[in-house]
């Protein structure tokens, strides 16, 4: 199984707060609600490549 490193970027301020290892077989980008320390609140984080 091939894995790749990806980052989760805040959709509000754009800062990359979290890093993940994800399967290359997934076609859609991951979107999660996570806490952004720069915004100080829960925001939507999207996977960057």
Curated annotation (Swiss-Prot):
It comes from the Bacteria. NCBIfam families: PRK00504.1, rpmG_bact. The keyword Nuclease does not apply. InterPro entries: Ribosomal_bL33, Ribosomal_bL33_sf, Ribosomal_zn-bd. The keyword Ribonucleoprotein applies. Pfam families: Ribosomal_L33. Belongs to the bacterial ribosomal protein bL33 family. This is Large ribosomal subunit protein bL33B. Keywords: Ribonucleoprotein, Ribosomal protein. The gene is rpmG2. GO terms for cellular component: cytoplasm; ribonucleoprotein complex; ribosome. It comes from Lactobacillus helveticus (strain DPC 4571). GO terms for biological process: translation. GO terms for molecular function: structural constituent of ribosome.
């Amino acid at each position: 199984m091939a894995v790749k490193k990806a980052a989760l970027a805040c959709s509000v301020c754009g800062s990359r707060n979290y890093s993940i290892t994800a399967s290359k077989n997934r076609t859609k980008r991951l979107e999660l609600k996570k806490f952004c320390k720069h915004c100080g609140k829960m925001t939507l984080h999207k996977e960057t490549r």
